[in-house]
Amino acid sequence: MKTLYSPRRFYPVETLFNGTLTLAGRDQETTGFAWWAGNARLINLSGKLLGAHVSHAGLIVFWAGSMNLFEVAHFIPEKPMYEQGLILLPHLATLGWGVGPGGEIVDTFPYFVSGVLHLISSAVLGFGGIYHALIGPETLEESFPFFGYTWKDRNKMTTILGIHLILLGAGAFLLVFKALFFGGIYDTWAPGGGDVRKITNLTLSPNIIFGYLLKSPFGGEGWIVSVDNLEDLIGGHFWLGSICIFGGIWHILTKPFAWTRRAFVWSGEAYLSYSLGALSVFGFIACCFVWFNNTAYPSEFYGPTGPEASQAQAFTFLVRDQRLGASVGSAQGPTGLGKYLMRSPTGEIIFGGETMRFWDLRAPWLEPLRGPNGLDLSKLKKDIQPWQERRSAEYMTHAPLGSLNSVGGVATEINAVNFVSPRSWLATSHFVLGFFFFVGHLWHAGRARAAAAGFEKGIDRDLEPVLFMTPLN
């Protein structure tokens, strides 16, 4: 246990794949890292590492801009977004650009502007990345001490952390300002089937906002994923932005406490592992959010959630059979339970049949038909609006269940249908990315801790078995 508090672990430790510590050049012989170790060659070259990061940002923004324009070029306003394989335009529509009542797209010009702005930004980032990778100083410490750093300088590292937190807080406030002052955002709960509106009274009560964090993640509780109104959503961003900005100022002004210095490993690879761990958590949360939440990810743009499509199917057939004369309140199904309606474990009236498992779904097309005890039988008989029928029929046939090489996977679809919901894409991609980032977190954390403890020398490539094998001929 003594090594845990040994001063050795505070020295600049990096785990090499090859056994030399001279880091002047960028080839395998001088850095100890082969080409496939990526930016590890640049660990101690802050100027070149800046070039790599700015170039990476340029590639990301270039993808965003070009994919945005690609989706605009292929967009058909008459079809729902979720039928067209779009993954970027739904985000822009959710922010209230180009959308009219009921989620109808009335103007695609804002989407075009977004794509062009991202392309222009990517050109600037690309130029900066190439400049710093090829022309700019190898290290920033001498010429630009404010931007220079050494990995073991804990005060500088927490200052950089603080700057990042302030930028994240500013990003959260951008959404708050858009919702409050700059045209508002799309609210799927607006009466009559959704509309863009300004958020006038955002929720600032800490009891409500932090109550979400204290909820169980299971069942009808749903942790923060259960947020079902824009007031709470924007209020949460206000709180989060404030906390990030104040936390950022704190980290810039203070030095790490003694317990922090002892608890953490202070090396480039350790910071990489912390970042990957955080991104992994973000990925898993985003996966659950896009899969279950139809407020932050409106079904008008992303397609229905799984429970929503299932409940929509029950609702559609209830409407049909009621028109044909069925008594939906008393009809029995094959199991003796109610065919169309039954009671939940807590006594509410819910849809019967297989969709009973999704009885606590909340959706804007269904909520107007509820009373104090669940679904209201008189409302189901007299108050169903045409837009509710249309929307549920649409959602019933677009469940987020299809696979790439199969039909949609719901009994109501004909064999020719091959539909993959953007909800499926976004949820599965974020789950997979979250998982891989978690593996990366474990890998780099293990290497960083081993290097700090002083018993990991890297992989000795000189004794690699393949070097002693007869060449394949």
Curated annotation (Swiss-Prot):
Signal peptide, first to last residue: none
UniProt remark on cofactor binding: Binds multiple chlorophylls and provides some of the ligands for the Ca-4Mn-5O cluster of the oxygen-evolving complex. It may also provide a ligand for a Cl- that is required for oxygen evolution. PSII binds additional chlorophylls, carotenoids and specific lipids.
N-acetylthreonine: residues bearing it: 15
Transmembrane segment boundaries: 69-93, 134-155, 178-200, 255-275, 291-312, 447-471
One Gene Ontology term, aspect cellular component: photosystem II
Gene Ontology annotations of biological process type: photosynthetic electron transport in photosystem II
Binding site for [CaMn4O5] cluster: 367
SUPFAM superfamilies on file: Photosystem II antenna protein-like
Entries under Pfam families matching the protein: PSII (PF00421)
Keywords annotated in UniProt: Acetylation, Chlorophyll, Chloroplast, Chromophore, Manganese, Membrane, Metal-binding, Phosphoprotein, Photosynthesis, Photosystem II, Plastid, Thylakoid, Transmembrane, Transmembrane helix
Single GO MF annotation: chlorophyll binding
Localization per record: Plastid, Chloroplast thylakoid membrane
Membrane-topology descriptor: Multi-pass membrane protein
Modification sites for Phosphothreonine: 15
Keyword Cell membrane: no
Propeptide positions: 1-14
Domain of life: Eukaryota
Purpose: One of the components of the core complex of photosystem II (PSII). It binds chlorophyll and helps catalyze the primary light-induced photochemical processes of PSII. PSII is a light-driven water:plastoquinone oxidoreductase, using light energy to abstract electrons from H(2)O, generating O(2) and a proton gradient subsequently used for ATP formation.
Family: Belongs to the PsbB/PsbC family. PsbC subfamily.
Subunit structure of this chain's protein: PSII is composed of 1 copy each of membrane proteins PsbA, PsbB, PsbC, PsbD, PsbE, PsbF, PsbH, PsbI, PsbJ, PsbK, PsbL, PsbM, PsbT, PsbX, PsbY, PsbZ, Psb30/Ycf12, at least 3 peripheral proteins of the oxygen-evolving complex and a large number of cofactors. It forms dimeric complexes.
Protein name as catalogued: Photosystem II CP43 reaction center protein
